Amino acid sequence: MELTRRQMLLGSLAAAGGAVLAGCGAGGGSAAGGGAGTTAAAGFPVTIEGKLGTATVPQAPRRVASVGYTDHDAILALGVAPVAARYWYGAENTVVQPWASAAARALDAAPAVLTMSSIEPEKIAAQRPDLVVGVYSDLDAQNYPVVSAIAPTVGPAKGFHDYGAPWQEQTRLVGRALGRTDEADRLVGELEARFAAVRDANPQWAGKQVAVATRGADSLSVFASQDPRSRFFTSLGFVVPPRYDELAGQSFYAELSFEQYAELDHDLVVWDQLSFTPGGRATVERDPLLSRLPAMREGRAVFLEGGTELAFAWQTVLSLPAVLDAVVPALERAIPRA
């Protein structure tokens, strides 16, 4: 499958490491034990305004299809088994990743697999959903009306760039649509408290500038401040240089030529999506231009590989605890406490 630049930067099709939940392949989904209809319906109907339109959910949904690349994590975290989920990253045709496997197993979730490359209205309709979730998705002005005609559709959030809504917004939007706002708030609060604890324990990171970058075969890229991957570091006290937003415009990333490598000259450089870099980490470390960066020479570079790269790409309420476990020690080595 040929990847567009956007799909590559989103992280599609990387064969990152990690065990996956057995049995989560294509086929009919099951909502057994996980339908949102098992909760009280007093809060319905629910109306949610999005960037592309308004979704009115008349009653607690029982068959939820996820067309967002990562939205099924929030659905699972809130105790609902999606009947369909979008493939994005990792082992091919696997939509439940290691950090979500326990939640999926508890719900007996076996979602039908929707392809990464495009929205598939026929496959969505075949699952007979009464709610479609596509917060972190490629829903747009052309395909949103088609999908929303199948079932009420919660699309990209208002007030954010494409693919820019943070995990908190994603979790709370899904919680509202499922009638589980209290549970969504609880999940968000617990994870935010963990970020705060790490931030408080590492005051040396406050105000330090970070570049979250990738190295492709022909160019470099850096994520803008609204991208969830950059938000991960700002949640820990780091700052994304305003220059990156200028370069990115309305996109979630800015593409740089190799000659622009000095744009990455900041306190911390984080190398992401190394599974797409020909030769991986070694290529970055040996690059004659990138190796000139002070952060590279002085040990202030962090490399996200394997299962960590995979979890970091997701940026969800379920994946982020694993990311914190893996990345915080590396950050403490790169910029240690005085």
How would you describe each model-predicted region?
Residues R63-L78, E183-P242:
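Basic- and aromatic-lined ligand-binding clefts that recognize polyanionic substrates
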Residues T54, I150-A217, A313-A338:
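Extracytoplasmic substrate-binding proteins
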Residues R128-G134, P152, H266:
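Proline-aspartate-enriched helix->loop->beta-strand connector
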Residues H72-K123:
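A short, structured surface patch at a secondary-structure boundary
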Residues C24-A36:
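Bacterial lipoprotein signal-peptidase II cleavage site
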Residues Q7-A26:
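N-terminal export signals
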Residues Y89-V95, L139-Q142, A157-L173, G207-F232, ...:
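Extracytoplasmic ligand-binding site segments that recognize negatively charged/polar headgroups
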Residues L264-A338:
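Structured C-terminal subdomain patch of bacterial secreted/periplasmic proteins
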